[in-house]
Amino acid sequence: MKTIGITGGVGAGKSTVLAYLEEKYNAFVIQADEVGHIVMAPGQECYQPVIDLFGKDVIKNDKTIDRKRVSDVVFEQPDFLSCLNGIIHPAVKRYILKSLEEQKKEGRKLCVVEAALFLEEHYQEFCDEVWYLSLIHI
């Protein structure tokens, strides 16, 4: 199985490339940002640690984490960001690695991982290629 990592700036066309690879080559596409939402859902790995860090005020009526409230706290108190990242990023990486392993077992030929902090989180360690997309204005 080949794994391609994709990263790049805002508006560089990442979503377009992901959709193309998924449609044209039947690629399994996994986006770190979406995984971040999954691991913070009720009953998932990061749910309770995030509540422990930010307090019960971040729980909405439907029991999900109020991401806006979390971002407000992080904006006002930047020290919380490194703590939050220490909870979320390792869980996202584990989830992605598990998903890639499952796809390999199912015989998938191509997987694509997209992440904003691709290099910072060392995702290149489990990718065969890394594509950095950028948009050049002329």
Q: Can you say where each PLM-predicted feature lies in the sequence?
A:
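Walker A/P-loop
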Residues: 15
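ATP-binding Walker
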Residues: 12
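P-loop (Walker A) phosphate-binding loop of NTP-binding proteins
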Residues: 9
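Conserved small/polar residues in nucleotide/adenosyl-binding loops
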Residues: 137-138
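Hydrophobic anchor at the beta1->P-loop junction of P-loop NTPases
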Residues: 6
